[in-house]
Amino acid sequence: VEAEEGGLFRSDDGGETWEKLSDNADIRGRPWYFTHIFADPQNPDIIWDLCYNVWKSIDGGRTFAQVTTPHGDNHDLWIDPRNPQRMINGNDGGACVSYNGGASWSSIYNQPTAEFYHVAADNHYPYRVHGTQQDSSAIRVPSRSYKGAILMSDCDPVGFSESGDIAVKPDDPEISYSVYPGGIIN
């Protein structure tokens, strides 16, 4: 619960009664958006908390230690029920795999991953899609390529606009406008 008196609570009777385990504010950042709790399928004392960062408890949720991951804004976690050392973490940067219980993670730089909030097409031929990405820049991507695939070298940054809106000037497809949270216009 994200509140002044919030925390992590546990019920062992289907919600009839609750015990407050922790009031650590670090583990409850933006709970309405992405805080999720995961229990190890083989050890009930191991609890994972995902929010901005990843947190791990080995004492049933009373204390937590931060776990380093390749990217922030962690949204989801899959724990292999037969081998809890094997996990997949979904975050704003993509997906990261661990084979050692979160001690290390695979890179996010080996996969074309983007989380787009807004897109717009321009009048260029062939048309290009302009988009604002979560935790990254605004980008312009061609709709096709003569190289057999659309490569990153075919794409262009068109400003910085995490999750803001984007528009392309109708009479000049080389000009785009993007809005960054906080009212900054690029």
Question: What residues fall within each predicted segment?
Answer:
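Beta-propeller blade termini and top-face loops
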Residues: V1-N186
